[in-house]
Amino acid sequence: MKARTILGNLVNQASQHVIPNNLKQGVMKNWLASNKEKNTFKRSATSESLRTEKELKRHKNDNCLKTPDADVEEIEFIDIGATNIQSPKAALLVEEIHFIDIEDYDNKTNAVLPVGVTDIDTIHGDEQHLWSEYAPEIYAYLRQLETTNQIKEDYLRGCIITGQMRSRLIDWMVSVHLQFKLLPETLFMSVNILDRFLEQEGKNTSRDRLQLVGVVAMLIASKIEEIYIPTIDEFVYSTDNAYNEEEVKDMELKIMRTLDFNLTSPISLTFLRRFSVAGNVDVVEHSMAKYILELSLMDYGLVGVHPSLSAAAALHVSLLLLSPSVPVWSPGLEYYSGYSRECLMPVVRRMISLLESAEDNRLQSVRNKYSSRKFRRVALLKEAKKEFLTKRMQFA
C-alpha cells in the first residue's frame, strides 16, 4: 500500500518499508563523518558549582534559563579516558520554567570560574575538534539562538495535522534515518525543520502531504550535516514511491522559503555533548540520555521546550537511573548547563513518563534502535523498565 494512503492512519510503519542493500550502498558515510565524533569526551576532574541569580519575565510566564555526543556509527568512537567508549499541554511545562536574563549568561563567557568548578575548556584545550578556546562564546550564542528560534508550544492547535500524526511521522523518520545510516545531528535537525515549517504552514498542510514534509526535512538536513547524501530517488523510495522527484523539489523550495532560508536553530544533541563532558559521564550514561532525547522528539508536549533544557533534563534522568548513589546534578553540571535541579523537574518527570510507556507504545523505532549493541542496549537495561522507573520517581 502506498504511504500516501496510509497517512489517513498516519505514516507507514518502518517495518513495511525497509530500504534494500543496493540502496544502502549508495548511502555511505565517509570515515571523516565518523571521525567527527571521535574522542568527543575525555575524563575531566569533577566539576563543582554555581548558581545565577537575576530573573526576568519572559512572555506571560515566569519562565528557568540561567547561564550557560555518536549514534548509529559514532557511538563506537566515543572515547572517555582510557575506555572506548505522549500528553499534558506543553504550556503546563513552560509555566513551570523560569528564565534568567541571557546577559547574565553572556557575562559568564569572560567570568572567573567559581571555586570548585573545573574549567573543562582548558582541560580539552589541545582537542582542536572541540574548539575549546571559543566554546564559551559558541554556547552563549547557541543559547541566544534557541530563544530566538523557539518553537511555540501546542502549535498544531486548529490544524488538520495532530500531535499524534506528528509522532507517527517522526517514528517513521527515525527508521529511515537508521536505514540510511545518517549522522545523529541529521535526525534532530530534520525534526526541527519539520516543526518550524508546520508551525507556520500546519493549517495549509494536508494529511497526504505530511510524509512528504518529513522526508524533505530529512533531505534538507542531510545536505547540511552529511558528507554523502542520499539521492532524491532513495528518499522517494523510502516513502514507497508515494511522491515523485518534482514533488520533492517543490516541497524543498517551499520549506526553505517558509523558513526564510534560516536553518541555524541549535539542537539538543549539541548541548548534551557539552553537558556530558561537564558531568564526566560514561558512554552508557550518555547513550541513555540520547535515548531519552530521541523519545522526546516524538512527544508533542515537549516541542516548546528549549533544546538546552531538554538536553539537561535527559542527562539528569540518565544519571538518576544509572548513578543513583552520587549527587545527580553536580555544581559543575549546574554551572555549565545553566539549569538548577529545580528548574529541570517538570521536564524530568515528563521524560520519565516517556520511558515508562516506551515498552508498551506502538511507536517502537527509537526503542528498537537503542536495543541494539551499537547503542549499548540501553533501552533493555533494567533501569529503563517501568518497575524500576516507578521506584526512582520518588527521587525525581
Set out the residue ranges of the language-model regions.
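Acidic, serine/threonine-rich low-complexity regulatory regions at protein termini
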Residues: 1-215, 219-396
